[in-house]
Regions:
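Conserved, mostly hydrophobic/aromatic
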Residues: 7, 248, 295, 383, ...
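Intrinsically disordered, low-complexity acidic/polar segments
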Residues: 14-17, 42, 267, 313, ...
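Carbohydrate-recognition beta-sandwich/jelly-roll modules
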Residues: 1-237, 242-256
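A mature extracytoplasmic/lumenal domain signature
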Residues: 9-13, 262-264, 308, 384-386, ...
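A structural signal for short, well-ordered beta-strand segments and their strand-loop junctions
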Residues: 6, 255-260, 302-305, 380-382, ...
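Aromatic-lined carbohydrate-binding/catalytic grooves of carbohydrate-active enzymes
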Residues: 206-293, 297-363, 387-391
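Short loop/turn motifs at secondary-structure junctions
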Residues: 29, 252-254, 374-383
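Active-site-proximal substrate-binding groove within the catalytic cores of carbohydrate-active enzymes
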Residues: 106-108, 116-124, 129-131, 308-311, ...
Length: 595
């Protein structure tokens, strides 16, 4: 029931050193490969939709008439920070975490699965009435990255990746008919495929964890002896963390899983992690060991957070040497990530973050493990490996690492880490899922592109039953009630991010997004959330999310493997479903017998 398309890129021929009419030599490499761009394209009279895995998932209805919109064109696994930086200030919305796409036409559908070359792929989708009369979706593979170098006195020229991607491109097309030919059927079939290929593994427990993020230290400018200095401000000390854990367990919350960010020296912008030293402003090494042991001995789990893919500050005494260990852009400049000044739109170079080359990950992870083991933690949180993927275009001999090779490197290091610890990640790109127990910051929305018509919880349908997952922290979203309903619809666990410090301490810092993180202010809401919603999660946690339906405007139904369903009403008025009244901005839990 499938078609396998393989393109051996190494065998592609293109003109090399051909002579033009002026006698000059030129080489014309293949930059992009589009695979079956009109495969099963839908016509003007067809009904159905295109599935794009944008964020949680989204549908583009066939012939939707939005001919004024841009073509959907997004990179699988999001932005590569070694590519040319944007020439204008932009936001990067939800990214693609799964290399899959689909199209439904009448009672037939196909699912496209990118098996090889996923890290260098873009997904392109468009509707009829623009370029032609077809609705279509296809993958486009960037086998040679290109960039632009601007000259000092005007003009520019193109520059290309030193080495061509040499792996295969492989796309599998799976066909669905009848009742299976919808996005729920696509999600089930893709989940089966991932399980068969060892990319998803069953959950270890059927007891839903209560997820809480603690913010340890963050950089804040303080005036010391008349001189402004950036110091790690202690938002949650190790003693504070123990007090918060005790308070939650005393309130009846069980199976508390703590993600502890900013515990390492330097706080959230921690030092190069070749060592696992604690931030002194939070407490001593002995106190941190005691905290880890205490949480684990009292029925909880702790996931100290670390980022391996970037360096916030390069010190002379650490193991990072920028000229050797930093990733390079195509123009051989060290790759850096910038914040942009909202008034001038200029990059703020003082706060630039250096991108670490995938080439050094094996050495870096080995060094970290050796030092981190002394704390006795059974868990580890990876702040970047689950969503960020960067190349290294260093032109040194044998030093170029394309994005596909980078994905393999990250996957190998995650495998090593998962052999020792339970892993928590952000985002949840596919290559990270085989080694992950918990995924946080999972998208519950799509990017909101104009061409898209409907968001769906496709990602959650795929990973349900095989990973615990949660969306954004409920205390950091603009409408926590609506976001909680979205979490219920998707089977996503509630998630909070708190600190012992008052919220105003982040004012005027890069971390003012934590403007509502004081634990004391959120404590009652956290306990109420647990008491109201965890009886629901005890019924659906560990169950496969097998069917999702759009019942009417603002009303959805999610059905799980054990027959339990959740009907969510997003409207500002009450509705009735199957004889059951559901209040405005409310939900209803239906058990297998319809009660």
């Amino acid at each position: 029931d499938s078609l396998l398309v393989t393109i051996p890129v190494d065998d592609i021929k293109y003109p090399i050193k051909v002579v033009d009419f002026e006698g000059e030599e030129h080489t014309f490499p293949i930059v992009f490969v589009e695979v079956l761009p009109y495969f099963s394209a839908a016509g003007l009279n067809d009904e159905g939709y295109i599935l794009v895995p944008d964020g949680s998932g989204a549908l583009i209805y066939l012939n939707n008439g939005k001919t004024w919109t841009s073509t959907y064109n997004q990179a699988v696994y999001g932005r590569d920070y070694t590519e040319d930086p944007p020439t204008y200030v932009t936001t990067y919305p939800q990214q693609i975490h799964l290399p899959v796409f689909g199209l439904k036409m009448g009672d037939q559908a196909f699912l496209g699965i990118i098996e090889r070359g996923d890290a260098i792929a873009h997904l392109r989708a468009d509707i009829s009435g623009k370029r032609d009369d077809f609705n279509r979706i296809f993958p486009r593979f960037n086998i040679i990255k290109s960039g632009t170098i601007s000259l000092q006195h005007g003009g520019s020229f193109n520059i290309y990746q030193p080495e061509v991607y040499k792996g295969d491109i492989r796309v599998r097309y799976v066909f669905l008919v009848g009742e299976e030919a919808d996005y729920s059927g696509m999600a089930r079939r893709y989940q089966e495929y991932l399980v068969e290929n060892g990319l998803l593994t069953p959950l270890k427990s059927d007891d839903p964890p209560f997820l809480l993020e603690l913010i340890g230290a963050f950089p804040r400018t303080e005036v010391i002896m008349g001189i402004p200095r950036s110091i790690p401000y202690p938002a949650t000390t190790f003693a504070d963390a123990k007090r918060i854990f005790d308070d939650l367990t005393d309130a009846g919350i069980s199976n508390v899983h703590l993600r502890f960010r900013g515990w390492m020296r330097g706080g959230l912008e921690h030092q190069y992690p070749d060592k696992a030293a604690v931030e002194n402003n939070l407490g001593t090494e002995t106190e941190f060991k005691s905290l880890v042991a205490y949480v684990q001995e009292n029925g909880g789990a702790i996931y100290p957070d670390v980022g391996f893919l970037s360096v916030y500050r390069n010190r002379l005494v650490d193991g990072f040497i920028g000229i050797r260990d930093a990733a390079r852009r195509l123009d051989q400049i060290v790759a850096r990530v910038y914040d942009y000044n909202i008034a001038t739109f200029e990059p703020e170079t003082a706060s630039a973050i250096t991108v670490v080359s995938p080439r050094v990950l094996e050495r870096l992870v080995s060094s970290f493990i050796k030092d981190f083991d002394k704390y006795g933690s059974g868990g580890l949180s990876l702040s970047q490996m689950g969503w960020q993927l960067n190349s290294d275009f260093n032109r040194g001999k044998g030093r170029t690492i394309d994005r596909q090779q980078a994905a393999e490197t990250v996957s190998n290091e995650m495998r090593r880490l998962s052999d020792k610890y339970d892993i928590m990640v952000q985002g949840g790109n596919l290559y990270a899922l085989p080694y992950t127990s918990i995924v946080v910051n999972v998208p519950l929305e799509d990017s909101g592109y104009d061409i898209v018509d409907q968001r769906i919880p496709f990602y959650q349908m795929v990973v349900s039953g095989y990973a615990a997952y949660a969306g954004e922290p409920l205390n950091q979203v603009s409408d926590s009630r609506t976001y909680m309903l979205m979490s219920l619809e998707a089977g996503a666990l509630p998630f909070f991010s708190v600190a012992a410090a008052e919220s105003e301490v982040v004012k005027g810092t890069r971390y003012d997004k934590f403007h509502s993180f004081n634990y004391n202010q959120w404590r009652n809401a956290i306990v109420s959330c647990y008491l109201e919603y965890y009886p629901v999660y005890k019924l659906i946690y560990g169950q496969r999310f097998v069917r999702h339906q759009l019942l009417q405007d603002g009303v959805t139904k999610s059905t799980f493997e054990n027959g339990v369903s959740i009907v969510v009403n997003y409207n500002n008025y009450a509705i009735e479903y199957d004889g059951v009244a559901i209040g405005a901005k409310g939900y209803c839990l239906l058990e297998e017998d319809g009660r």
